[in-house]
Structures are given as C-alpha cells and as structure tokens.
A protein has these predicted regions:
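Aromatic-rich, lipid-facing transmembrane alpha helices and their immediate juxtamembrane interface loops
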Residues: 1-169
Length: 169
C-alpha cells in the first residue's frame, strides 16, 4: 500500500523530494514483491528470488555500464544514491520490484513461453521507465545509431538488451 501511495504523489512533486520519492518507490515496491513471494511461494522461493535477481541485475547492469552491452552506452548520475560497481544500489531492487510480478503473470498465461513473455514484459516496462528517468537526469545514453521511436535520447539497442536480459532472467 505504501508503494502505491508514494506513486500517487509522483506527478505532483519535483526536485529533491522527487529524487527521494523515486528511490523510496523502488525500495517499497521491491519489499512488497518480496512479501508477496514469501506469502505465496514460501521462504525458499523468496530468498532464492531475492539473491538471484539482485546478483543477476547487478551483474548485467555492471557489464552494461562498463562494456556498453547489452543496453548501449549509458551511465548513471549520482542522484540514485550509493553505487556498487558503478550501478546504483536501487537499480537491482527495481529489477526485484518488476521481475516477480512479470514471472508470476507469465507462469499463469504463457505456458512454455514464459521466457519470451518475461522478456517482452520487462522490455515494455523499461520503455515506460526510461523516458521519465532520462528526463529527470537519473541516467543518460550516448546515442550513435537507431533510437527508440519518439525517444531520440534512448538507443534502440537498450530495448533489445532488456528483451534479451529479461528472457534470460
């Protein structure tokens, strides 16, 4: 409930309050998803989900920042707080917040295609998220090739990176 309430005021604020709100939405959302994982699937699943998703996200984001693959040439600003291996700590928790509901939905509707549904859903979430975060200066890309339609500041390779990493996760 707290994560939802925080999101309701999101369009009404700016500046430092918005920066702190952004971070809190992610942590509270991740906490809600972990609580759901615990209550719906048990302790073992919740702990496995937490650690696997956290380390996968931290690893793929670190690779992305350092090598420009698979998301393109990007960097995070200092606005998102403490960084681990050039990745803000809040970023793996954003993956935790989104991957669990995607996995839960995919298992219910996608049958043997869970991996594809998961990749598409996470890429779609990123298409929603990136324009806001770029506009707020949370991260930036150097775009040298094709870009996301109507979003010249976001390379198309980022969407494919999310599709690929989402399918793998």
């Amino acid at each position: 409930a707290i994560a939802i309430l925080l999101q309701l005021i999101y369009p009404l604020v700016d500046g430092e309050f918005l920066r702190l709100l952004t971070i809190n939405v992610v942590y509270w959302g991740a906490g809600a998803m972990l609580l759901h994982a615990l209550l719906a699937y048990g302790t073992r699943y919740a702990i496995t989900y937490l650690f696997f998703t956290f380390f996968f996200a931290l690893t793929i984001e670190h690779i992305g920042v350092m090598t420009q693959w698979p998301f393109g040439n990007y960097s995070y600003s200092g606005d998102l707080g403490l960084k681990i291996f050039e990745v803000p700590l809040v970023v793996p928790f954003a993956w935790i917040m989104m991957a669990h509901p995607v996995l839960t939905a995919a298992r219910r509707i996608a049958g043997n295609w869970v991996f594809l549904y998961g990749g598409i859903a996470l890429a779609a979430w990123d298409l929603f998220l990136d324009p806001m975060m770029v506009a707020e200066g949370r991260w930036t890309w150097v775009v040298t090739g094709a870009h996301v339609p109507f979003q010249p500041e976001i390379p198309l390779s980022n969407t494919f990176g999310w599709l690929l990493s989402g399918m793998f996760l």
